[in-house]
Amino acid sequence: ILSMLLIASPILFVLAVYPDSFSMSWNQGRGGFLFGLAFIVAEIIGIKFIVSRTRLIFGIPLAVATIIYFVLLDFGLHDYIINAAPAFNVQLIYSWEWFWDFLVITIFAISASILMFGKKWIRIVIAGPVFLAGSAIILSLDAFFPYDTLGPLQYFVPHLVQTNVWIINAFELGTATARDNLMFLQGDHGPFALQVFWPSAGVHSVVIYSLVMMAFLLKMNIKQNRKIMYFGLGIIGTIVINLIRIFSLSVFALKVSTNPVEFEEY
């Protein structure tokens, strides 16, 4: 329990001091911290591994140093990070800003896990750090390669768009056509164009899910065929959820409003 509290302490501190920063939007807040914490807690609870007092004591400075980082953000560090963005040709400031938070918490989670559990940390508490690291990687990609500039991830988007267009026309919700990642919608409130990029299409969630599921499945003592089946079903489920998200946005434009402000708020 003490090891779990130690690893969780920086996240709990940030949650207590900056609760408004925990937005569930993937690139506009620290909501991902909670998912990472949930994975860590789920993995540690129930294990029969005794962490020595010495390891716990050595872990305290790591937690304190991480907490200090988040405190310093209010004392000029945040502005320094934002001002440094142009020097690295960063396109999206929000993703750049949150990338550093996720990078720091990832380094802490991995370092603390190694310190607490030694070489066995990969078998004990891998999913949480993998989720946090995956989030940091995706945020960095979004910061440096925004919109459709990252070809491999953007490659899947037109297929999702075409599927969404087919569903709209099949259910006669309006008129929809597509060209690459651009949808042209004609509904009750007039025409509306919706351009979909890989982050908004949920490609990032598929990537992060894949990493986390691989971490979990490697630990599970089940047959290889079952692992492949669970992994595949999870990928399909994640894609379906992202399709539903794109579809709901399209229905809003078709049936509710084409006002850009209202659309953004939705």
Language-model segments: residues:
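Hydrophobic N-terminal alpha-helices or hydrophobic patches in metabolic proteins across all domains
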Residues: I1-Y266
